[in-house]
């Protein structure tokens, strides 16, 4: 394998199975995790970019588990490993919607994984962010809740 398609150190902590089963699934997978997306990036934009590397089988948009709105990630599944490897080589680190996107191997989409795992429904990484990021909903959600004006005082 070349460096651009090697497995990263990230592992899904909710994977159902042993570490060796997860490693095997990642090495055989045709599914990619795509992160650092703008909340406004559409499935059509993702399809247009990733279809340059092969036939996309399915795209599953990551959603806020409470609002059911996009929350900055998705899964892209190809028909073959070679197509997924091409996306790892050529799409990882490219710009989409003015953001550098991150592409990583995924062991395969399982229903329920399309929802953010953070306390407020989105991604954990967006809950504690202290910088303002217009493409990802402004300030971090937990910080926004702390500084939101109290409108109940009359």
From Swiss-Prot:
The gene is Cbp20-B. It comes from Drosophila virilis (Fruit fly). One of its GO terms (biological process) is regulatory ncRNA-mediated gene silencing. PANTHER family: 20 KD NUCLEAR CAP BINDING PROTEIN (PTHR18847), NUCLEAR CAP-BINDING PROTEIN SUBUNIT 2 (PTHR18847:SF0). Its main location: nucleus. Keywords: mRNA processing, mRNA splicing, Nucleus, RNA-binding, RNA-mediated gene silencing. Signal peptide: none annotated. This is Nuclear cap-binding protein subunit 2B. It holds the Pfam family RRM_1. Component of the nuclear cap-binding complex (CBC), a heterodimer composed of Cbp80 and Cbp20 that interacts with m7GpppG-capped RNA. Interacts with Ars2.
């Amino acid at each position: 394998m070349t460096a651009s398609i090697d497995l990263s150190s990230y592992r899904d902590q909710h994977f159902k199975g042993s570490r060796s089963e997860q490693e095997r699934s990642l090495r055989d997978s045709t599914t990619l995790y795509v992160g650092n997306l703008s909340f406004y990036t559409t499935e059509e934009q993702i399809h247009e970019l990733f279809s340059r590397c092969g036939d996309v089988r399915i795209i599953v948009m990551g959603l806020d588990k409470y609002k059911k709105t996009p929350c900055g990630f998705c899964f892209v599944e190809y028909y073959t490993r070679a197509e997924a490897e091409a996306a790892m080589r050529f799409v990882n680190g490219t710009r989409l919607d003015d953001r550098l996107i991150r592409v990583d191997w995924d062991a395969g989409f399982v229903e329920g994984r399309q929802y953010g795992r953070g306390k407020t429904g989105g991604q954990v990484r967006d809950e504690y962010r202290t910088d303002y990021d217009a493409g990802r909903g402004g300030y971090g959600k937990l910080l926004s809740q702390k500084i939101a004006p109290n409108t109940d005082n009359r």
